[in-house]
């Protein structure tokens, strides 16, 4: 596990820049106009970015952060405290004006897992029940 990368960047077939990390983050630009990554530990564990506003820098206009770490039902409770776990449809959650997507369906709690095609944004949600026996 220690040798795995903590982040990756992918440009999809639509020309969108996708930043992937376990916990997600809000991108920021350096003074030179490059991406300023956050600390590796934050890319793995942080939940502090959920309510951040998306940066207005031109380089992030066609950028999307894809992450997991926090199951969608719990993330929704951070964004809207009126949401409750049992009321959430299984699948990915798009937020931050469509620039962030959490793909953690919370399989251990909900029994669902989601996959997201980074080129088409098609989502596949499936039940983990058949695999838990």
Provide a role label for each language-model segment:
Residues 113-115:
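C-terminal regions of proteins
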Residues 128-133:
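Short, solvent-exposed aromatic-acidic interface loops
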